[in-house]
Amino acid sequence: MSCWASIDLGPESILFADDDLVAVDKAPGVLCDASIDPNREHLGTALRQWAQDDSAEFLPAHRLDRGTSGVVLFARNRPAATALMKQFQERTVSKHYQAVVHLPTDSAWTGGDTLERRSYLRHRKGMSEEVRSGGKPAHSGFEVLHIDGPLALMRASPKTGRTHQLRVHLAALDAPIVGDERYGHSPLT
């Protein structure tokens, strides 16, 4: 089975649209843009089909990993893209995710616990890693929402925007995301 989802932008996928902005509910397996593989369909091409305009611009204000689902904002013109990028750079926009994670061995975590992780991350060859020097600062906040046996539902809030930041930080806390083959344990059986 392919990990590439077909891109069907039905009415339920478009959460908001005006002349400057489109908010899209991205399914897992879908690329946000052509940066990874210019020959693969991505949300930008699907939005041009949705708009019925092959020359329309849809510029992602941020990205989600291919395997991640969630809301992605696209600017429909350069001035809107500039304004959105400024908001992300100045941190006037916040992002929050939910993830099911493996609990650390002998964890004393309970629902409502909050955790932070600060480190330096270096990204190369498709992987990010925590390093003592030579990386960029990364800061994440986490809240335990629910615990069920060996798993926990976490709210994850990146304070910086490093590649794979939340995945690396959760793995460093010995709480990798379930199903994360790159930074986590073996898949849940």
What are these regions (language model features)?
Residues 1-189:
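RNA pseudouridine synthases
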